[in-house]
Amino acid sequence: MFFQFLLLLAAAHNAFAKCRCTPEDDCWPSASKWNALNNTVAGRLILDEPLAKACYPGPGYSESKCRSIAENWTDEYWIAKSPIGYSYPLVDTCPPINASIPAYPSCELGNSPIFSIDATRPEDVATGTKFAKANNIRLVIKNTGHDISQRSQGYGSLSIWLRNLQSGLQLHKNFSPSNGSCDAKWNGSAITIGGGYVWQDAYDFAAKRGHVVVGGGDPTVGCIGGYLQGGGHGSLSHEFGLATDQVLEYQVVLASGKNIMANACQYTDLFTALRGGGGGTYGVVVSATIKTYPTRPTLYNSLTITGLQNDSESVLNATARMISKFPAIVEEGFAGTSLMGKTDGVWVYDAPFIKFLTNDSSEAITHAKEVMNREIINELLPGNGTKYHVDSQWQTYRSWHEWYGAVPHTTPGANQPMMASRLFDKGSLVSRQENLTELVHILSTSGSHLTSGSFMIMNIVAGGKVLEKAPHTSVNPAWRKAYLLLQQVDFLAANAGSAETKKAKDRLTTTKLAAMKELAPGMGTYVNEADSWDPEWRKDWFGDEYDWLLSVKRKYDPDDVFWCWRCVGNEG
């Protein structure tokens, strides 16, 4: 069972666990201390209970509630409404019994926090931080729960839940730093995101004012948490840079409980660390101000390749050829996220490409289509109808927001996913076609008997402005050479035991990730979409920035009040 695998994770944390008080220890805070904390945060301390508790015999059992839970079990909006709702992976130590995953004989919190503070003010964050430090208990930070590495979870911990800390969204026509003492190198428009808003909120707010912001593909992901602090990519990052490149200012609660503003003028080292060095470890960001840009027309191409029965080779080979062409279309301004996997036993490649147009003149649109046809679609046509079916559709939208609203972006919560990824530079894509084809086959077919399914994600979100290092950023330097972020996602079988789980994980790390590294040596990956068991995680996730980031961590959090799995400062 997957819970047994989580126990392996807990064992890996054992050295740290001995340093923090847990509910089994005499040093665990007394009921009176928890009551006092609850009073200080105005009754917003939550004793966490498993999401599906209503499905199990005992107090709280409800057949109707259980039915509702099962119906919403993979709905990301529903998941985010709980202080212990996690999208990747779903907490499966207490699944709804009538959901499409096997029931377990007991219902437990597992790795979820014991208590959560439903923070609505920065003062609540400061209170929770100081309480955790004073009582030597583990502290975790959670917004919406999109974290495949489980960094917002922690056994026996106190969680600060930021989803309901929402002080508003504010547009600045001409930005200047809070203290105005230095030049921020940006006097254009900006938006301050005050707390636990999601990208859909920010996109809607910006669109009503004729603007766009660089954010994530999934509208349910939180704006100012690990996504932004770890780099952040999306359909507009090629045009304007990574999401973290857009940050002009952070409001941060430090490990001491102090509430400060970090920007290019003050707390500059902390500001830099929070622009790419990962979330959950330097302080708690409660507000961020990011750049905005005028919206423009958007050209959209929907490309689908559907394999014929009993022919897997053709789609895999065609996918490899297309990947080798990505740098050419990236340099013409195209972006997008493609997926390839099996649907009803047939290989399907689905690629939504977009181009953020400077104008919607017929000349601009014709040129963009010519590039896509020349580099991608014409390459596929010889096999159309004999090896696979190709479908290509074009659509022009008046604005980026209109395109975003017309195309599905929300992904369901996934049970027991495992991910590995790698950033690829131009040379590794265009000059090693044979190796690239071999890689696609390894990722798609190796170890398939160990998983219940898998798919490959090709994120064309780099190149362009991403290649330009923005001042005061600490993102993995590999991003500044990257044209593609390639991800492999494998799903454990629902009934996988600990032995099967270990085999699947080992295959992902030692075979699939290793093959990616071999094709793109000297690169790295995106900290938020990486293999949690990569033995070279410091180098692969942070590159040459790690040692400097660690020095910032030690400066602002010498007692490790903030500690999370595979975060800077996690030396276990």
Predicted segments, located by residue:
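Fungal secretory targeting signals
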Residues: 1-17
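Soluble FAD-dependent oxygen oxidases
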Residues: 16-572
